[in-house]
Each structure stands twice: as C-alpha cells, then as structure tokens.
Amino acid sequence: MKRLLFVILLTIMGCCGVHVQAVGYEKIINPVLPGDRPDPTVIEINGEYWAAATSNEWSPLFPIFKSKDLVNWELVNYVFPDGAPDWALNNFWAPELSYDEKQGKVYLYYTA
C-alpha cells in the first residue's frame, strides 16, 4: 500500500508542470557615491545628508560629500585637502560621522 501511494505521489508530481525560470543577472548601475567608496557612513544634519567613505593608500584624502536627496552627491572637501599626514597614509577604513548639536561640530572617526 505504501509503495502504491508513493508511486501515485510521484506520478502526480511528474504530471504537474514545474516552471523554472532561469536566473538572470543584471548589472545595477546606481552608485551612491562616485568612485570606489566602500564602507560609507551617512548622517543627516539640518535637512542635508553628509557622507564619508573608506579611502585607500593611493588616495588617502578622506572625501566628504553632501546631498539633499541621497541620490545626487557633491564632493565638499577632504579631511586632509593637502594630503594625509604620515600617520594617516594607510590602514584607515570604515569611517563614522558623528554630529554634536551642542557644539555644532561634526566628528569623523576612522578605524586604524
């Protein structure tokens, strides 16, 4: 009896059309920040969004961006506009922006 039920179940499953859709991969072109900017951090200050991201040894300037809509970003400046000091030339990543309302200052922390 169990064998008969098993055969009936297999037959029913075989008769049911299984539609398998091929998985297609499409390239999504929607960069949040221009260029190679891993580990971004974003904060909102008075209706504007501010962002920073990991730099690298080839460009250790630590860029700062701002946006009003989280889509269109403007490069504002760099933490080190004249080039990073020797102590900050490499191994800095995963920044974090923090805003102190009382002082009206933005702090930028990096993992080293």
Predicted segments, located by residue:
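Positively charged n-region of N-terminal signal peptides that target proteins for export
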Residues: 1-4
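Bacterial N-terminal signal peptides
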Residues: 6-16
